[in-house]
Amino acid sequence: MGAVSCRQGQHTQQGEHTRVAVPHKQGGNIRGPWARGWKSLWTGLGTIRSDLEELWELRGHHYLHQESLKPAPVLVEKPLPEWPVPQFINLFLPEFPIRPIRGQQQLKILGLVAKGSFGTVLKVLDCTQKAVFAVKVVPKVKVLQRDTVRQCKEEVSIQRQINHPFVHSLGDSWQGKRHLFIMCSYCSTDLYSLWSAVGCFPEASIRLFAAELVLVLCYLHDLGIMHRDVKMENILLDERGHLKLTDFGLSRHVPQGAQAYTICGTLQYMAPEVLSGGPYNHAADWWSLGVLLFSLATGKFPVAAERDHVAMLASVTHSDSEIPASLNQGLSLLLHELLCQNPLHRLRYLHHFQVHPFFRGVAFDPELLQKQPVNFVTETQATQPSSAETMPFDDFDCDLESFLLYPIPA
């Protein structure tokens, strides 16, 4: 889950919603106590109706039967349980199946990894597997408010199809009364946090990360998948220092030759054709890679963030990214070919990278790349403290409130 939020815009000519990302902010993911307004998602007493029920009636949602919901009867003796009507279960099937309650015997929360406007990511211990995972928790009411049911389901559907060593693997997904849960392998840090700490990367590390990302993007594009949000915050680093591409929330199946029109992603990483509202294709991901590599090499973004996509498009179109003369000639050429305004002339195919001067001597093989050490990453990870405190839950869905009031930092 990135730190960037998107807001709904108007429908495009292709019927898609326009989602415009807020400019990149320093500091990565937001941490700290949750706003008290979120408390209403877990507490519904007596005549207080579920947020989900009220939202459903207001929406007149077209996915399922639109029968009106009756108000909950008044019971003075004890409060009514706030259990969503069947529509709120069926709506997220089959990508989010209903499972027996994961509770104290299976999952224990180790800490809070990150929190954004759409949900939170928790570090959990699976007591059965004796392994640590990251669980993305998304309130159903937020999904309905933002009309992102399809987006959430497609995120899980895409991740189930992917099997690649440089992709953050999906462990499980399920739904509770009020939340959707996506469980993945746990990584202790991300590329943005490392970049914020060390600034410019050594050329050897840039070459290794670039090769790993090239393999990932080529793999996804061969499957017809556009990621659409390639950025440092969405690249996790494993215990050996190698990357794992994550967050497929904006990804979409786009067959070769087809085009997309949705304005989505993170402003400073978005290609000119995306900022202008399309049409665009898989070449947009390669522009994002160029922005990322430029930042690793220079310690800054090629173009400063603007307030919206219109201003960002003007900046990208009318300003040439000055590549420092001190950079390796091969790296300078690579950046020029990735940050090409015309997507038709942009570097994009695996064989082009294999013969590129910057990658001379690099074997584009995942197993061989994983054997190469990334010392400064592992050394940085070794200095990070970890929390030994855990919080067991009887009901992983309903008991989240107590943790969110007093989160344990991961």
From Swiss-Prot:
Residue span(s) of domain Protein kinase: 107-274
Reactions this protein catalyses: L-seryl-[protein] + ATP = O-phospho-L-seryl-[protein] + ADP + H(+); L-threonyl-[protein] + ATP = O-phospho-L-threonyl-[protein] + ADP + H(+)
The protein's enzyme class: transferase
Chain residues that bind ATP: 113-121, 136
GO MF term list: ATP binding; protein kinase activity; protein serine kinase activity; protein serine/threonine kinase activity
Keywords, in A-Z order: ATP-binding, Kinase, Nucleotide-binding, Serine/threonine-protein kinase, Transferase
Matches recorded under CDD domains: STKc_AGC
InterPro entries (alphabetical): Kinase-like_dom_sf (IPR011009), Prot_kinase_dom (IPR000719), Ser/Thr_kinase_AS (IPR008271), STKc_AGC (IPR045270)
Active site: 229
EC nos: 2.7.11.1
Pfam assignment, any one: Pkinase
Similarity section: Belongs to the protein kinase superfamily. Ser/Thr protein kinase family.
Protein name as annotated: Ribosomal protein S6 kinase-related protein
Organism of derivation: Homo sapiens
Gene coding for it: RSKR
